[in-house]
Amino acid sequence: MYSMMEHELKTAGPPHTLQHSPGMSPPGSGVGNAHHVSKTACPPGVDPMDKVKRPMNAFMVWSRGQRRKMAQENPKMHNSEISKRLGAEWKLLTDVEKRPFIDEAKRLRAVHMKEYPDYKYKPRRKTKALMKKDNPVGKYPLAAGNLLASAVAQGQGGSPRMDGYGWGHAGGYMGMQGDALGYPQQLHRYDLSALQYPAAQPYMNSASSYSQMSYSSSPQQPSPVMSMVKPEPLSHSPTGVPNHHRGAFQGDLRDMISMYIPGGDTSESSNQRAYPGVQQHYLGGTVPLTHI
């Protein structure tokens, strides 16, 4: 059994000696060979030229050392602010001071063209520009342009909802004028119903009686504005009193009058004779002085 295991280990040993660790390069391979391997390591569906960076220009060559120096002096400064300051300093340099950096940029460009002869600069699209193009105004119904367009369309053709509420082409003022013109006729009906009230009621005050007398005595037709205001005190009173209730009202009035008339043994005939005078005092808004 041990002999079989030793035989298997001997057969499996030589292939391991031929393999190399991933961190070490095989013998005879240089830097150029490693560079070739990195170029072919891209996935098959991706263009290897997309991973290649542009050659640095003169400003990038100069700012490479200046940026590091400024970042060490101002650790809390943002990178965008550093770029602004470096750009302002680069513009202040003279052509003589820029010359060595320009020559270095030309050399780097020549090396780049030699290493990547098929390279073409392809600027990447900005994500913000794509978002604006992918979201046109038509996708949002509440945009300002769509609201203006819908308002113009409703102004030309009219809206069925607004027409149903009386705000169409004619406007809502026509209905209001018609309602205002219909108020005088309703006031006539109130005047006729006011004539059916009994002559005196125990809960009637001088203000309501005065308003009824002014309505019934006015011969001319009131204006629409006055007709909209005056029917309000009449809306709180009943529209009419049946004839069989008049006797009850008169009996209650006699009982109330008999409390103030001296001599409680007077007959009903004397109360009836005193009733018209007291009724006149109540209608006039004055209190009878017979009990004094």
UniProtKB/Swiss-Prot annotation:
UniProt keyword annotation of Nucleus present: yes
Biased composition (Basic and acidic residues): 1-10
Entry keyword Phosphoprotein: yes
Region (Disordered) residue spans: 1-35, 209-248
InterPro entries according to UniProt: HMG_box_dom, HMG_box_dom_sf, SOX_fam, SRY-related_HMG-box_TF-like
Annotated GO CC locations: nucleus; transcription regulator complex
Biased composition (Low complexity): 209-229
Phosphoserine carried by residues: S159
Keyword annotations from UniProtKB, A to Z: Activator, Developmental protein, DNA-binding, Nucleus, Phosphoprotein, Transcription, Transcription regulation
Compartments in which it is found: Nucleus
GO MF, any single term: RNA polymerase II cis-regulatory region sequence-specific DNA binding
Any GO BP annotation: positive regulation of transcription by RNA polymerase II
DNA-binding region: 52-120
Highest taxon above the source species: Eukaryota
Cited function: Transcriptional activator.
Protein name: Transcription factor Sox-19b
Protein source organism: Danio rerio (Zebrafish)
